[in-house]
Amino acid sequence: MALIDEIRQKIEAEQFEFSKHAVDQSIIRRINVQETRELFGDAEVIEDYPEDKYGPSCLILGKTREGRPLHIQCSYPSRPLIKIITLYEPDPDLWIDFRIRRTS
């Protein structure tokens, strides 16, 4: 099973939690839990961080039902609960099609 499919399966089963940082950022950036769930429907892994210092994680791009693009960094599904590390609306000045980081 693909990484995104395993993550999606855990999200749908409510097997996820937010880091304190993600909770703080969701309040500041006005991203609610429902939007977080919605974006996994057509989500894709755009960056992979297998050697992340706190454990393997990846950056996911998805869109809410309203079409709002969001990035979520989360742990691999090998954990009992997926940890949502951070989430934000990507800046189009920093991303090409919200998928590829622009270089200077």
What do the PLM-derived regions correspond to, one by one?
Residues M1-S104:
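Ribonuclease/tRNase effector modules and their secretory precursors
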